[in-house]
């Protein structure tokens, strides 16, 4: 069990070479336009994404993929991979999903997870497939996987905000400390989210992401 936990820490580490730190998911444009301009507004922005996207889209699909992979249900795996890509409302968000998936498809075999052609295709569709596949291979508990996934996203996004607003490193750590208190409730909500309601509910982020694609000066990829 301890080894599974250690594998999980590696999976969500900021040092993992999958490009998690290269995207702002619309945050850069939101800061440019003054929507996010302080620690308080950044915290509100991230909290809205946690409740309106992670809890209702990413974590429920991550759970579905992990369960379907464990059962060997390839049709359901394909359905949820397709669903995940279709749920990314902007070109920028779809590219991030695919490009991180491609990076995972290169990395996982180096970590002992062999991918046949079908699995490789699915991983290249969405990074969630990589997380689910690794969890099944390394016997990682679903609740721990979901908690770690949210933490990894939160850490990367807070650090992006620290650079862009800008905020001090201590302010970033204080924000992480506070927002982490929401993670158990987010994970719990995702466990009981109705399958027919799976989707994203963050229109401001979608607008920011679409506008970021043509933003004149960018630090983050589009």
From Swiss-Prot:
Gene3D superfamilies, per database record: Urease accessory protein UreF
Secretion signal span: none
Keywords: Chaperone, Cytoplasm, Nickel insertion, Virulence
Subunit structure: UreD, UreF and UreG form a complex that acts as a GTP-hydrolysis-dependent molecular chaperone, activating the urease apoprotein by helping to assemble the nickel containing metallocenter of UreC. The UreE protein probably delivers the nickel.
Keyword Chaperone: yes
Annotated GO CC locations: cytoplasm
Domain of life of the organism encoding this protein: Bacteria
Classification via Pfam families: UreF
GO terms for MF: nickel cation binding
Coiled coil: none
Main localization (coarse): cytoplasm
Protein name: Urease accessory protein UreF
Its biological purpose: Required for maturation of urease via the functional incorporation of the urease nickel metallocenter.
Family per similarity comment: Belongs to the UreF family.
Location within or outside the cell: Cytoplasm
């Amino acid at each position: 069990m301890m080894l599974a936990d250690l594998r999980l820490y590696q999976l969500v580490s900021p040092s993992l070479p999958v490009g998690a730190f290269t995207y702002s998911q619309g945050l850069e444009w939101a800061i440019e336009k003054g929507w996010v301009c302080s620690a308080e507004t950044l915290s509100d922005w991230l909290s809205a994404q946690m409740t309106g996207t992670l809890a209702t889209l990413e974590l429920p699909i991550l759970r579905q993929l992990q369960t379907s992979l464990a059962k060997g249900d390839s049709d359901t795996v394909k359905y949820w991979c397709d669903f995940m890509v279709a749920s990314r409302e902007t070109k920028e968000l779809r590219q991030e999903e695919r490009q991180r998936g491609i990076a995972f498809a290169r990395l996982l075999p180096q970590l002992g997870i062999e991918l046949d052609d079908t699995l490789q295709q699915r991983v290249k569709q969405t990074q969630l497939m990589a997380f689910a596949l690794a969890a099944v291979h390394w016997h990682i508990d679903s609740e721990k996987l979901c908690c770690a996934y949210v933490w990894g996203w939160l850490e990367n996004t807070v650090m992006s905000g620290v650079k862009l607003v800008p905020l001090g490193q201590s302010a970033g750590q204080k924000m992480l400390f506070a927002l982490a208190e929401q993670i158990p409730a987010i994970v719990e909500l995702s466990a009981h989210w109705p399958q027919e309601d799976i989707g994203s509910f963050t229109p401001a982020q979608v607008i920011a992401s679409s506008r970021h694609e043509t933003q004149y000066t960018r630090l983050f990829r589009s």
